[in-house]
UniProtKB/Swiss-Prot annotation:
InterPro entries tied to this protein: DNA-dir_DNA_pol_B, DNA-dir_DNA_pol_B_CS, DNA-dir_DNA_pol_B_exonuc, DNA-dir_DNA_pol_B_multi_dom, DNA/RNA_pol_sf, DNA_pol_B_thumb, DNA_pol_palm_dom_sf, DNA_pol_type-B
Protein source organism: Psittacid herpesvirus 1 (isolate Amazon parrot/-/97-0001/1997) (PsHV-1)
Protein transport in keyword set: no
Protein name: DNA polymerase catalytic subunit
Transmembrane regions listed in the UniProt entry: none
Taxonomy, superkingdom: Viruses
Pfam family membership, one: DNA_pol_B
Catalysed reactions, semicolon-separated: DNA(n) + a 2'-deoxyribonucleoside 5'-triphosphate = DNA(n+1) + diphosphate; Endonucleolytic cleavage to 5'-phosphomonoester
Function statement: Replicates viral genomic DNA. The replication complex is composed of six viral proteins: the DNA polymerase, processivity factor, primase, primase-associated factor, helicase, and ssDNA-binding protein. Additionally, the polymerase contains an intrinsic ribonuclease H (RNase H) activity that specifically degrades RNA/DNA heteroduplexes or duplex DNA substrates in the 5' to 3' direction. Therefore, it can catalyze the excision of the RNA primers that initiate the synthesis of Okazaki fragments at a replication fork during viral DNA replication.
GO cellular component: host cell nucleus
Family: Belongs to the DNA polymerase type-B family.
Amino acid sequence: MAAFDNPVFNKTLTPVAGAGPNFRATYYTSVTEFTHVCPRSLIDGERLGTSVGKVADPPRFTVDDRTVDMFSHDHGAWPMRMEHWPGTSAERRRDKNALRFHEFHVYDIIEAHETAQSCSAWLHPRFMETLRPSGTVVTLLGMSACGKRVAVHVYGQQPYFYAKKSEIDASIGISTPGELAHAMAASLRSAASRRSTFVEATAESFVIDVVQRRDIYYYESREEEYYRVKSCSAKYISFLCDNFCRGVKKYEGGIDATTRFAVDNELFTFGWYRFKPCAGAIQIRDVTRHSTSANVEVNCTVENLEVIRGRADWPDYKLLSFDIECKAGGANDLAFPTAERIEDVVIQISAVVSSLLTRRVEHEILFSLGTCQLPEDIADHVKVCECGSEFELLLCFMTFLKQFSPEFVTGYNILGFDWGFMYNKMVNIYGMRLDGYGKANAWGTFKVQDMPHSGRGKFRNVKINGIVNFDMFSIIYQKIKLCSYKLNSVAETVLGEKKHDLSYKDLPRLFALGPEERGKIGAYCLQDSRLATKLFFKLVPHMELSAVAQLACITLTRAVFDGQQVRVFTCLLQRARKIGVVLPEKSDRFTFSAHAAGDQDDGGRSVGYQGAKVLDPDVGFHVNPVMVFDFASLYPSIIQSNNLCYSTMTHNPAAIAHLEEGTDYLRVEVQGRVFFFVREHVRRSLLAELLTDWLNMRKALRAQIPLAATEDEKVLLDMQQIAIKVICNSVYGFTGVMNGMLPCLEVAATVTAIGRDMLLKTKQYIEENWREYSNIRERFFPAMAHEGVPQYSVAVIYGDTDSVFVSFKGVPVACLVASGDAMAAEITNALFRRPVKLECEKVFTKLLMIAKKKYIGVIHTGKMMMRGVDMVRKSNCRFVNDTAKALLNLVFYDEDVATAAASSALVDVSALPRGLSKLGARVREAHAALSSPALDVRDFVMTSELSKAPKYYASSKLAHLTVYRKKIARNEEPPQVKDRIEYVIIAPGQRIQGDPFREKETDLVSSLAEDPNWVTAHKLRLNADYYFSALLQTLSVTFNAVFGDAKTAHIVMRSFIPDTLRYPAAVRKILAENTKTLTPM
């Protein structure tokens, strides 16, 4: 073998020479030759360099001091859940009576394409009839109630589409289904040069009937005749939808077979099934005909199946948590490894297997490149599989994945790094086929794709048939707001555990030192898998997303990866099917946006209509109690109460000319455009029906939670009600996405317009009906003791989308808290149609109203709440945050300071109240701290998210981009998109000799940004002036409400640290006066 150390080598090697057990499987069970890549340190002890060569021996690995064949079934390194691996006794024919089962749970559904020719020798005639000449088979993957791993193949699912009969007949001059079948077959055969299978198309390839249906769009739509075109071949349907009679609108042709199977038959995509008795023959497949790694495979039709409603337990599915460690292998082994370079290798993979039923770890395995001696405290619990080359390491892990066959996989950032790195290595470097490494034995989905957002997304879309991936990084990123999403920070925050961290720069040194040091890497690798497992069982994402999958009638994998649009669409499809309504293919008939095709933001969200109204805030420090009223489920309730829907809307005044405005329909005008929605007694809204059913279901689930017998049952019920809430809140957004699956911007625009009107009506009602104390005392405060009329006043000081802030003077907080629900109910009953409901959310005892969507307050329980203010932003450093919070605590919890702050806006800034002296003392303390020589760099670290790839930024003059470029220049681990990049600002003129970063320092602050680790290592000075200015900036924005405006607030805060050299005479005079005022501190 040749030594290799060229860091830019990027050539794809000869594909691995190997094969599966038979023509029906593509996972490897034999390899005769492969490319051997390993670090030179494993051969001759040299730390640098990589050995690359060809090996004509079968791959092997060592476990328990035994060297075993990679594909043997009796090595004992891990359990063999896949019973029929070549050479095992289970591969022989078995007693079919022992294989029978009645009830089974489904966790995933996959699709396959079968032909009559390939199955004629063994497939039962009942199922052969469904393949003419080929067909789609829907396979339900799961586990039987008796513990068997099963695959149930459902034959006979025919994809189809609709088209208006009148339009098809006029387009091609026909009038019957038979004529249409012949025309379609001819169209397919004429395209046979492009698709060879089309040459077999005949009129018998289709089943066409005429049905009564109604288009979902517009009130004037009426039932009429539609052709429903069915075929065994999904390819036929897809081609015809796109190419046959292109001027004729097609309906529902893009619905996949799995969705059709579940929606049309009212079946689950996740949950329990049973076989119906006396519903037709089923067939247990012989082991030689298995197409998956399941231990029992059954053929049936949909008539054989029924769901078991109300059963919520889970079978004993297995969870695999894995993590990989890599190292660079070129001339500079301290560079960050990339999968595209052959010399950068995966050196270890940890695998921790747990039971979802018991939530206990059952097996721990470490796959190691080279020998590895784990520390004694964990060595007895871990199987170590030692491999001689990277290919053998990857193949060993993939063989484990196939043989053990876990249903669920987790890890930390496995979508952003681990899966992508291994996939690129296996496919692009070693030329491996991976389509047999999910549950399917061949031709299964195994995709690792970047999200198509122009470099804006970190997460990859990883879809492996029969394996559901939960990346705990992406789940925590979406659910929990943290300053850092590094695993050690997350573990400390969520689990209360600290991680022993190891820099990737330490890996080359430790790896080259030998088995004992490699054991330290192994312990670190295992630690990450264990923490990911704990995070998984802490947050139980599978519980919530499986509830979403079941409710939305989509697979669990789609619930994880495919966003909100598909969830609402399938629910709407279910409802539409029941009432004879059809959904068009990617409709362009939403006229409100017809003239605004380009009027959208980068995310595809339409901005062609005005957003929710925000009532201008009464900026200031409010010491009178402030009650916050909140509209419960505002947008869903607006859709329900106003009967908004595709099917209730019209732009045509003639369509509602016979109806009475107000009573029979709602007239809406948005930005000069007028449209109408009929009331529910004229036509019921599909969206409103869906929302009503969901919310009733959610209410019932929430009522069951306190009655649940076990904690697991409580968690499941809670996750189910959360799933319903998420989907309900998605309906408004579903209609408002211009490039979505079924857009209707009129609905979204009406929702926001009505929301604005509701805020204004609420404000008007409060200020007119509650203006006089005598009008509300008997209704709301009958027990309040008083003499005469108190100094009472009421004012709406802010309105924010679904909340209204009301200030009460002369009413005790306790009375407001006690009467809040009654006050909200009065407004609801007076103004709104049900189910719109106003609720009393909270009462602030003090409120600092800063600006729109920015406020800080203390609620009646004593807890401080913040929204939109600088000090709770992730980008601020700890020094600024801590100082700002300390000042806030003084303002809210010290009555002297609070009284002074409330009056500050009313007095001349040159004569501030003496009560503010405590603020001045704290600011001086912070200023003095910046002069200390013993500053902790971590207190001054700021972070900014790398929201997209650096090349997509309009300007590179940003602090976090400067640090990004410095890390690249220094061959350090490059931050990935969606990472938060840490940086500090250093004093100018501190260049380190030998620093490979060569950009010149400029006057811009961004050029002074530096990596905190580099600052610590080289003892660089921080920029004290910058940090004090940053503190003043934050305080100015936060306290502008106290002092009238941000400029005045800045002057006041700066006055606590007098510096006559930096200010003009007028400002120096103010500073001098304030210094005298604050002298008694």
